[in-house]
Amino acid sequence: MKKTIRLSLLATAVIVLASGFALHASLTASAASAHSARGAAGSPADSMLHATFTDSAVKGTHGQGLVELILTGTGTVQGFGAATDVVGVVEDFAASPCGPGGASNSSQDRIAVHGGVLELSTTGMNCVTASGPQVTGTYRVDGQASTGIFAGARGAGHFTVSAATGQDTLSGTLILAEPGA
């Protein structure tokens, strides 16, 4: 039984890791480059985030039904250029909202570009489907923790990750604070 649980947790850690890679492999949200729209806060062009990352695990631990991972990577954010990200992920397999093999999922994402750091908080669930593990959930922009051009930003949206294919989608909003506000 102990061996089965360990193998299950190891398999889950691999799924979580793949989910983390996928979530940050292609970060896409609806609406235009926030950097170019900085002077026009509130315009439709001020509500899009598009970024791509390739992440790798720095550290992973498991115990008590929890898997914790730290992921880092590099990529680009449209309108900002080169970027790095650091992601702390926690999956709780004792709280499976979608049945056996599933888990609740949360992460804190830090995306750094020249000009600022964007902080995102996510919550979701990792579910086993016929096409492989799927992670779905929501994200929220943390404007108080964000810095530089992202300080005071707000926004929210949804994300979907297919750990099996490495494909993911994040869609929602990013509204920058007005300069001097």
Which stretches of residues belong to each language-model region?
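Sec-dependent N-terminal signal peptides
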Residues: 6-21
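Beta-strand-enriched cores of mature, soluble protein domains
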Residues: 32-181
